[in-house]
Amino acid sequence: MDEDYVKKQEATIRNVLVKNLMESYVPFPLDKKIATQWAYAINVPRGGSTIIYTSYMYQMANVFKSYEKYVPTFGSLGSSKIIASIGAKLIKPKEEDIKRFNAILQNIYRIVKRSNENIGYLYEEEPYSGSLLYELGFMDEFKEYGKKVFELFKQHKVSNIITIDPHTTNTLTNLKKYIGFDIPFTPYLNLIKEAKGTGKFVLHDSCLYSRFLGMYESIRTTIRSAGVELVEDPTVTGKGAGFCCGGPVGPLNDKLSNEIAKARAETLTSVNKDVLVACPLCYANLSEFCNVKDIAEVIA
């Protein structure tokens, strides 16, 4: 990987991310009407002390992949304002992606309502967590933006958060460490009760859930308890054997990201033809190379 190229990519990404996040709480131009339609459709209460926090991850997952392809072009444009304008016109979620993430988010909401009837959502006022800043190593910006997110939640009197993806959960864990973020949060996977599911899958572990958040065993217990069969191979799905989907490196090198995803898909499908994931970015990266389902698509 060319060092100068990576540095140029990094500078472009930093410029775009920081400006968009500080101004609009999202990393890239996003149609929030589309991103929140899942909640309008089922009349999720607005606000409240306990909220489901999407951080727009399912809504943006496939859009992230599209942005990665345009980063070299954006790098030659210079102005983040120009980048944002062009990005908003070039990059929009496909109808099938919208339908899919709406169904997933609605199912997750129905699942968590079994443990608490009073769960709201911030709709268009929801902030992105800032996970990209942390994962790309922009630590000063991560802390600064994290304080804005923390303050926004406090303004909305949020006292309990339900996260739905590993990147957001890991980000809040690190905000707790770095800026004293003290609002309790729980992954929705830990709240699943009396769920039913079908199918036979090999599980692609989220690096964050399994390695950093200690959920390797609990996720498997949840899936199996719902009636879904998991096929294991210790050399592929063992606690120390899994490897990245390639997503995190995508903003810096889309080609390398795809090579990693293809290699991971090949090892997974050597165990079972159908793959299960617990992360929207893992889905976006792997689905080009194998048949993938999200946990929230196979249990309810």
Language-model-derived ranges and their functions:
Residues 1-18, 255-263, 295-300:
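Ferredoxin-type iron-sulfur electron-transfer modules in oxidoreductases and energy-metabolism complexes
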Residues 129, 207, 245, 279-282:
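Short cysteine clusters
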